[in-house]
Amino acid sequence: MSSEQLASRGHTTAAQVRKDLSHFGSFGKRGLGYSIEELSVRLRAILGLDRVWQVVLVGAGRIGSALFEYPDFKMRGYDCVAIFDSDPEKIGTQWGTTTIHSSEWLEAVIEQLDVDLVILAVPASAAQEIADRAVEAGVRGILNFAPVQIKVPDSIPVEDVNLVMQLEALSFKITRGGAGE
């Protein structure tokens, strides 16, 4: 497949495709294009999608429930191995075959199951404490749905998901009259 064909599928330019891929090594052959199978394997490895990631979910409220039910996580290699909450009425109940545990067991489970990622779906008031505990237990990254910025060591990547800010960005783009800005 040529860089032009890849570019048209990604709504970008052929030059941008070649430039982006060059950051990760040599791909394809001049005049022949790219082997899609080889490109797929190499990109999956670069993105860390060639393995299963152990994930715990902290927060069994509405956002946590929606995230847990999302089928693409499992299909893409994200295995939710445990759920935690502080609500006594939720502790001990099950979502599918997964039991909701007391958040006091967070560190032990992270260490025991060698958890890679934590999804925080907790109130702002609990986010920093949970993040600190998860980092101390050895987690390697955090997806933060709490409406607050958390502070962790620079070695721990954090992705903040703020739905209100994303809606504001979308409404700004619509107000400005451009979808591609």
Q: What are these model-derived regions, one by one?
A:
Residues 49, 75-77, 112, 136:
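Alpha-helix termination/capping residues and helix-transition junctions
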Residues 4, 93, 97-181:
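Phosphate-bearing ligand-interacting subdomains
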Residues 74-98:
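NAD(P)-binding Rossmann-fold cofactor-contacting core
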Residues 54, 80, 116-118:
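Short active-site oxyanion
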Residues 4, 9-55:
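HTH-adjacent hinge/linker in prokaryotic transcriptional regulators
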Residues 60:
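Glycine-rich Rossmann-fold phosphate-binding loop(s) that bind the pyrophosphate
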Residues 63:
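Hydrophobic/small residue at the entry helix of a nucleotide-binding pocket
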